């Protein structure tokens, strides 16, 4: 499954994963990253060689239930990589009975994209994100200067299977 292809990476409150392309004839290959960069803001990036193959859509579809599960107000150990062997916020998460701190609850996820990154906007809308707002000249790109940003949001779905 998709969640089995993710490798846990948790630094200073971020919740990020490597995306691996698994091939029968070769070992895993990291092709991108996905995660909560500043929750509730999510983000993803891929090696340009893998653009246009549906990997971003597949990864985001797999990640969003994990995002809402992790940021549900429940114990972090319930969702934060039970198989990872490191400690997070001083709490061991590999089966320890120590009480983990609560993850904050977010009822939406937000993605920021440049107005010209139409393929990324298409990925977001395919997965269920909706346009929320346009922010003018709010991001400074070192090469392109001040840029406008489009904000897309996905709200926590109600119903079974969603924490």
Describe the residue ranges of each PLM region.
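A short helix-loop-beta-strand connector motif used in the catalytic cores of GNAT acetyltransferases and
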Residues: 2-18, 32
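Acyl-donor (CoA/ACP) binding surface of acyl/acetyltransferases
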Residues: 16-163
